């Protein structure tokens, strides 16, 4: 016993009282005749020890029950029940409710992206998400896992650019040892097939490597696409050349690709031959700084940005006077680099320049310029590249599940990805288990299909490299439109170049299942309205928005409507989104929320760990109305998420 008359802690444990009286326990008057015993907690229902006087009860061993002893120090006002430590007294609960109400009130008044503590993130799919929501709980998050490489943010997509800018020759996506000579022969054969498919002219890589083969090269007459060189036309005067030069300078963005030896490879505008001296200056800048063990990344002067990205053996340069940041311009240059890899593979590109450092790469890329041109045009008007995500065709969840299940059942042993798309929008995607597609690879596939109308003529079997998945070799893609008069394109990616007939049979079985289940009619109906109107949201002043779920790698946006009907206005709107995006993802000082006011529209950006939201609002709207509209928009996206996103992706 302690000097104060109470038992020690060991004695209390021996008596069965267990833990000491909680500091937050409430004393209740003991009812007459009420004894001790075990009963459930007054608040949570857990079985707890009652502490009260009562008769001694014998147990089979003859010892008194420890939980029925009446300790002598228990007063008349005794505890008749215990409470769990998690229970809070009424007074404290009221204080907590008041604090919660104040926090909620501040959340509605100020949108700073840091209102919810990081250790109190919501783990439920709430109807109206909060900035502190955990990733995977936001609207549009896949319930069965992600389809793409898990890139949480824009920075995750561009983090590899640092090594390239510093002169690192690392080939991202290349796995395993360098290809053997037999592998190079296989890659050469695949490239010859791809060249025939895209340009109509077969090229043999082995012949290209012969001495003197690159001297005095001219464009093959049968090549399709923009000529790599543009000789002066007859009758051209000096004034016409000056006008052409002035028109060339008026373009807001130029893209150049050249080899480390200074050989021109690609130019967005103009002739590569006419710009060879300019490209030589660019290579000299890069080489001069590298000799000092440094690297040039960008030059900012007179409203222009000059961005350099080096991916050995290539150097890519962008010159722009747009709202894009240097980081976003570098991302576009990386897309151009990956586009070149998708045609050649990283292994073949390295092999070529190991054999000939001054090789003219236009020999192999001749005729494919339209694919690169189309990619730059898509990046200028399609927000998919800005968001680093894919957009889904709005479709009823039951129909999408039927399409995905039909793709899953119509499979072959060599298939890696089965993709159904329509107008650069994703309808369904089924992948091999433990194999994930990168959004950049999906964008390159979209660009390949939209660049050529020949795929509508029948079933195509073409080599394709997915540089973010594996830059060392070719896959083989079966590309076909389900019906000539629709935009539904089926893309089946296989690892076996000899498996055409088996993959073609997968297409036949897929179409049979669609007709049997009636899904082809629903798909036709959905293609009549491939985009939804912003009026469906029900916010009067809302003109347009972009919403991305980071965990799923998908985003949604309505159709661009008035006043952005012209192509110039649409590019201007995307330019405003690019400006907000660059401020939100600034490497030195990123912003969580941005409210931009302009003469024609107001914009709001909100970037959290789970999602990104960009809104275009009427210039007559106020900041308070824009902030209050966010919750309504997020509730609408939550309500329509099964129609706008792929929530249950399937695997083989």
Swiss-Prot record:
Task: Give residue numbers for the modification (Phosphoserine).
Answer: 128, 153, 188
Tell me the GO BP annotations in alphabetical order. protein secretion; protein targeting to vacuole; vesicle-mediated transport
- Per the similarity annotation, which family is this? Belongs to the MON1/SAND family.
Q: Which UniProt keywords apply?
A: Guanine-nucleotide releasing factor, Phosphoprotein
Per the entry, what this protein does is: Plays an important role in membrane trafficking through the secretory apparatus. Not involved in endocytic trafficking to lysosomes. Acts in concert with CCZ1, as a guanine exchange factor (GEF) for RAB7, promotes the exchange of GDP to GTP, converting it from an inactive GDP-bound form into an active GTP-bound form.
The protein's name: Vacuolar fusion protein MON1 homolog A
Q: InterPro entries from the xrefs?
A: FUZ/MON1/HPS1_longin_1, FUZ/MON1/HPS1_longin_2, FUZ/MON1/HPS1_longin_3, Mon1
Could you tell me which species this protein originates from? Answer: Homo sapiens
